[in-house]
Design a protein with these regions (language model features):
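Hydrophobic, Leu/Ile/Phe/Ala-enriched alpha-helical segments that form helix-helix packing faces
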Residues: 53-60, 100-112, 255-263
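Long, hydrophobic/aromatic-enriched structural stretches that serve as scaffold segments
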Residues: 62-90, 94, 102-114
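Short secondary-structure transition/capping motifs
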Residues: 41-46, 89-93, 97
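A gly/proline- and charged-residue-enriched helix-loop-helix capping module
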Residues: 91-138
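Short, charge-rich binding segments
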Residues: 58-60, 93-96, 153-154
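Active-site environment of non-heme Fe oxygenases that use a 2-His-1-carboxylate facial triad
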Residues: 1-45, 62-77, 125-267, 277-281
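Catalytic cores of Mg2+-dependent Asp-rich isoprenoid enzymes
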Residues: 272-273
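Charged, low-complexity intrinsically disordered tails and linkers
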Residues: 40-57
Length: 283
């Protein structure tokens, strides 16, 4: 699979890391947070910092959908013990790191948050949380997440997602793959292109985010290849007389086969993938 890792030279990454650290420290000292960074403290990322970040971060290859960048955040202080949930995360302890992540994201695109996710914060804390152990959400800890695309339920979901590994004592990785590697046949593409699936928000969203049963296609063509909206744990196939039925085991076999064809583990040491729309992910 074509992938891109660690764009630029060591000097490029060190320069970006130094600029990022200095900017984040200064902004945190002035009382900024990731959520009020724009426009209260900045109208845009400083040009030299944005250019350095873009030079240091590997943009995903369109066929792969992910890339790994290392070292940009290595100089930040330890954020303290892992909290029991995102609600108990200490904003002061992670202020510099959160600001740095927001600056990286804003250097690559327009940053936004979900009102129904972690009180609308731009930078989320994904930590194992009591009560979520067996759910198909990022805060689970005893179950393997099914292959899925992030926030598939929403037509205006992010085109670029940043995952930053802060602590990984058990050396666990993330699995990523692309629908463009699935080698789907023309009949399979035709079936999966029909707007038949209803994808609902996952269990990390409040109940009032359920929305309407809008049917959507699972795959569709774009100028640079197939794209996908896929989250089998939260997919339903409405029937006129029977309401909703689970995506598995009664969903079209082509939908289930997408997971089987997605098997492509992240290389050893790849802990912070930057992912794009065509990607399937699992942790």
């Amino acid at each position: 699979m074509p992938t891109t890792e660690d764009a630029g030279s060591d000097f490029t990454r060190r320069r970006a890391a130094a600029l990022l650290s200095a900017a984040a420290r200064d902004l945190a000292d002035r009382g900024a947070s990731a959520d009020d960074l724009f426009p209260r403290y900045l109208t845009a990322v400083p040009a030299d910092l944005a250019a350095a970040v873009r030079a240091a971060i590997a943009r995903p290859d369109p066929m792969a959908g992910w890339s790994v960048s290392r070292g940009l955040l290595a100089g930040f202080p330890d954020p303290g013990p892992t909290p029991e949930s995102w609600r108990k995360a200490g904003a002061h302890d992670t202020a510099q790191l959160d600001i740095a992540i927001a600056l990286i994201a804003a250097s690559l695109g327009r940053v936004f948050g979900w009102a129904g996710q972690q009180d609308g914060r731009l930078v989320h804390n994904i930590v194992p949380s009591p009560g979520d152990e067996n759910l198909q959400v990022g805060s689970s800890s005893l179950t393997e997440l099914a292959w899925h695309c992030e926030d598939s339920f929403h037509p205006r979901r992010a085109e670029l997602l940043l995952l930053v590994c802060v602590r990984d004592d058990d050396e666990l990785g993330s699995r990523v793959s692309s629908v463009r590697r699935a080698e789907l046949s023309e009949p399979e593409i035709a079936l999966l292109s029909a707007p038949s699936a209803v994808i609902v928000p996952d269990d990390s969203y409040p109940d009032d985010w359920a929305g309407d049963d809008v049917r959507t296609a699972t795959v569709w063509a774009s100028p640079d290849g197939l794209c996908i909206r896929y989250d089998p744990a939260y997919t339903r196939f409405p029937e006129p007389s029977a309401g909703h039925r689970p995506a598995a085991p009664d969903s079209p076999p082509e939908l289930s086969e997408l997971s089987e064809r997605a098997e492509s583990p992240t290389p050893a040491g790849a802990r912070s993938p930057v992912t794009t729309a065509p990607l399937l992910g699992s942790s």
